[in-house]
């Protein structure tokens, strides 16, 4: 994933955390975790706060990494933490998704989100959420969760909201594959693909959730001038530029060719489409 912080771009692969200069894209430094037995299973997601990068790892470990030096300063091995995924920060608390474990070669999906107090870097509590929690996002002091719950095949992945101001109450919102947020609005794509037919058939549904009014609007946030192929092309990314509200949607043709990026104004008016230069676009960061 990509993260913009301290006027730099932070990028993680499974084994490394890299930092790049914002303008030229020239790599400044990188940190490798392959020789650390606690972290060698792989970095999964990153978030930033107060000069530190917080990273989740397979194996149930969270690391506190100095954002300037990329040195690991603290590690927290979470009891009953297995393959950690998404992370998000709200009110000096780190929320960490605990997705699955393997037992006798079989996948066992979990339903935990861990809450880590960043002041003490200790586990504060464990929340019960939808099965296989994967993506976490903070907006307006709320935590939004997409859980890859495969029991909802026809409906899609489960979308929930965690409210730190209300004792971390967990509430179901609906279903979504991708989410992004700006100006009190969470933009959602529910991308459903039928893999049982050849070629596979995808159907995309675009909607929004108003954080202030706690309202899910099932009407599309795209205007009628949106390219028609967006309704049926597999999506791989949804991002919003918080400087101007522009919405970016990435699509993928998998191994068949390069993906595309579709750009829209905040009001859903189509602006442009361009080749992303590779397969499966999945992240974007924005600079003034």
Spans of features found by a protein language model:
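Predominantly soluble domains enriched in secretory-pathway, periplasmic, or organellar proteins
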Residues: 1-288
């Amino acid at each position: 994933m990509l993260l913009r912080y301290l006027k730099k771009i932070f990028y993680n692969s499974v084994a490394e955390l890299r930092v790049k200069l914002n303008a030229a894209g020239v790599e400044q430094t990188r940190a490798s975790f392959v020789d650390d037995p606690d972290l060698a299973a792989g970095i999964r997601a990153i978030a930033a706060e107060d000069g530190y990068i917080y990273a989740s790892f397979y194996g149930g470990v969270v690391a506190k990494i100095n954002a300037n030096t990329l040195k690991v300063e603290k590690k927290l091995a979470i009891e009953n933490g297995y393959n950690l995924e998404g992370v998000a920060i709200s009110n000096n608390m780190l929320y960490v998704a605990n997705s699955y474990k393997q037992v006798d070669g079989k996948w066992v999906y979990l339903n935990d989100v861990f809450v880590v107090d960043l002041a003490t870097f200790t586990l504060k509590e464990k929340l019960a959420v939808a099965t296989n929690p994967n993506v976490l996002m903070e907006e307006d002091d709320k935590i939004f969760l997409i859980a890859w719950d495969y029991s909802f095949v026809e409906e899609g992945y489960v979308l929930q909201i965690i409210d730190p101001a209300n004792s971390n109450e967990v509430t179901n919102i609906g279903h979504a594959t991708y989410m992004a947020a700006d100006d009190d609005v969470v933009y959602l794509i529910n991308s459903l693909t039928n893999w049982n037919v050849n070629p596979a058939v995808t159907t995309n549904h675009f909607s929004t959730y108003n954080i202030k009014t706690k309202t899910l609007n099932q009407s599309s946030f795209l205007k009628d001038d949106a390219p028609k192929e967006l309704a049926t092309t597999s999506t791989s990314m949804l991002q919003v530029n918080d400087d101007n509200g522009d919405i970016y949607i990435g699509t993928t043709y998998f191994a068949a060719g390069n993906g595309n990026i579709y750009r829209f104004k905040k009001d859903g008016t189509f602006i442009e489409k361009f080749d992303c230069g590779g397969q499966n676009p999945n992240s974007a960061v924005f600079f003034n």
